[in-house]
């Protein structure tokens, strides 16, 4: 069995969680599920009031909460958006979430916003830039964040730092934690032809504070080659489940989120997947005992 990493200080409970969808709210109120936490996308709650906040307040009274940002563009060349920083700070003050996270990606350039999580060049300049942005975000919040590893579809010739090493450097230099998206690891490994398990072994696993699981789509590029897309619109693939169990053998039990952002089924279908997450975590806990 692989050597297991020591765990960071507790944040989210080491249980199964689910991304919150407003269309499930009535069902949740009628029969609250036995879950450890819910995750919300920060930008959907950067308004002063309304139904979204009423629903989030209900969740916060009953569950741990993870706030996941998608638009701060930590990897971009532009300065961080002051309005988004203020919005994150307001959410933190209002709900005291158990975890706050963002992506290793960029989505803003020259003041324009792109509705996507775009890849960065892994070089020394990018490392300094992302470190500075993480430091700024963490200083704004007064707490460490978790940074999510990306799913990628292209690589840059200018990159001279391995992605896993880049993440190690970010964690070491900023004190941030890692949000380990296992589906992203699998998608990138297939797309670029590297060994997913070897990649995991090079990560700073002691810094992992949350794991994400999601489904992906299979497409073909212009040359007919298979490409996996981190689509979040399908059940978790069996290969990703296998990689998740391998990951838990390295990390021990970690708070694990099931993501579903497209083709959203009834809540019961998602809870069947979170039950499988809980079973994996229970096996991991038994091994750790």
UniProtKB/Swiss-Prot annotation:
It comes from the Bacteria. Gene3D superfamilies: Divalent-metal-dependent TIM barrel enzymes. It holds the Pfam family MbnB_TglH_ChrH. Transmembrane segments: none annotated. InterPro entries: MbnB/TglH/ChrH (IPR007801), Xyl_isomerase-like_sf (IPR036237). NCBIfam families: PRK05409.1. HAMAP family: UPF0276 (MF_00697). Belongs to the UPF0276 family. This is UPF0276 protein BB1291. The lineage of its organism: Bacteria, Pseudomonadati, Pseudomonadota, Betaproteobacteria, Burkholderiales.
């Amino acid at each position: 069995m692989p050597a297991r990493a020591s765990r960071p200080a507790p944040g989210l409970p080491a249980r199964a969680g689910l991304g919150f969808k407003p269309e499930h709210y009535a069902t949740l109120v009628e029969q609250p599920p036995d879950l450890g936490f819910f995750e919300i996308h920060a930008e959907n709650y950067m308004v002063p009031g309304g139904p979204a906040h009423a629903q989030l307040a209900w969740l916060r009274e009953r569950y741990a909460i993870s706030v996941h940002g998608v638009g701060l563009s930590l990897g971009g060349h532009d300065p961080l958006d002051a309005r988004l920083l203020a919005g994150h700070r307001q959410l933190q003050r209002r709900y005291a979430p158990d975890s706050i996270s963002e992506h290793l990606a960029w989505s803003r350039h020259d003041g324009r916003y792109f509705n996507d999580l775009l890849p960065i060049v892994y070089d020394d300049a990018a490392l300094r830039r992302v470190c500075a942005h993480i430091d700024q975000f963490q200083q704004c919040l007064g707490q460490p964040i978790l940074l999510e590893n990306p799913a990628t579809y292209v690589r840059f010739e200018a990159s001279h730092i391995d992605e896993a090493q880049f993440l190690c450097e970010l964690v070491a230099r900023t004190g941030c934690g890692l949000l380990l998206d296992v589906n992203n690891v699998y998608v990138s490994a297939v797309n670029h032809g590297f060994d997913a398990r070897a990649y995991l072994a090079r990560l700073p696993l002691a810094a992992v504070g949350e794991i994400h699981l999601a489904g992906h789509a299979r497409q073909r590029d212009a040359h007919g080659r298979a490409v996996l897309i981190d689509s979040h619109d399908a059940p978790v693939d069996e290969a990703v489940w296998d990689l998740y169990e391998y990951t838990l053998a390295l990390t021990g039990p970690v708070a694990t989120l099931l993501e579903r952002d497209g083709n959203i089924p009834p809540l019961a279908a998602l809870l069947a997947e979170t039950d499988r997450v809980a079973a994996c975590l229970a096996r991991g806990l038994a091994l750790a005992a």
